[in-house]
Amino acid sequence: FENLYFSPMISVAHESLTTTANASANYKKQEGSYLDALFNYSLTYDQRNSPYRPTEGYVSTILQEIPLVSEGYSIINGYQIKGYKEIVNDSVLSVGLYTQAITSLKTNTDVRVSKRLFLPESKLRGFKSGKVGPKDGADYVGGNYMASLNTALSLPFLFPTLDKVDFAVF
């Protein structure tokens, strides 16, 4: 299995959620202490011609977070793929798709507010981190599903003599 990478990880975390008097009912009902033991893994298939500044190929990753011991029992599934194609004169077009979903495994139970999903800054430009998506009152609470489609075009001919400058349009 050439260019196929399996990355497992086990993590244990303790979390204490506290709220204020003006918190919403959804926040207040999730107040308390939580202990999670999780098994995370990713499976990556890399067909790029180079891991650093690729010009051709793609990299595809499936990821999952499975609760081993948890008071919330939520599972995260995700998939991302990014492709690269040289257009002309060392200009490289990249297109990437990023998706994730979190699902509560307990019947009629919401996903814990601290486990909700937010798009990473690298996937969503022009917005404050954590300030996009569903709101509960004045608070951004993240979502159970997320997806982004990103494109970028590298233009190395703008600074041909500078080795340490990257320029991309996205």
Model region roles, listed by residue range:
Residues 8, 12-165, 169-170:
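C-terminal outer-membrane beta-barrel translocator/porin domains of Gram-negative envelope proteins
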